[in-house]
Amino acid sequence: MDDKKQHQDNLHIGRLIKSELARQGKSITWLSTQVNCTRENLYKVFRRPWIYTDLLFEICKALDYDFFNECSEFYKRHKDAEI
């Protein structure tokens, strides 16, 4: 599998969060205050394809967006395929 195809088939939660934050027009400073996390740590979150569930829960509440559902939908689409 080439890198581009693999990239498209993998869930990257950090990119999803960054995208939703931008869509809502909110700053990383705002989010860091809401979730009690430094901006530097949030930038690291954006670069990672994984996240701790407790932090994801806080981000979901702050942005009023269900990222857990994104994960669930990804699972449903890929549960029978090799990831």
Regions found by a protein language model. Give the residues of each.
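A short, Lys/Arg-rich alpha-helix, primarily the initiator
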Residues: 1-27
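DNA-binding alpha-helical recognition surfaces that contact promoter or target DNA
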Residues: 15, 19, 44, 72
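Short, basic-rich loop-to-helix N-cap that marks the start of a DNA-contacting helix
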Residues: 48-61
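Recognition helix of helix-turn-helix/homeodomain-like DNA-binding domains
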Residues: 36-51
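Short alpha-helical "recognition helix" segments of helix-turn-helix
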Residues: 31-32
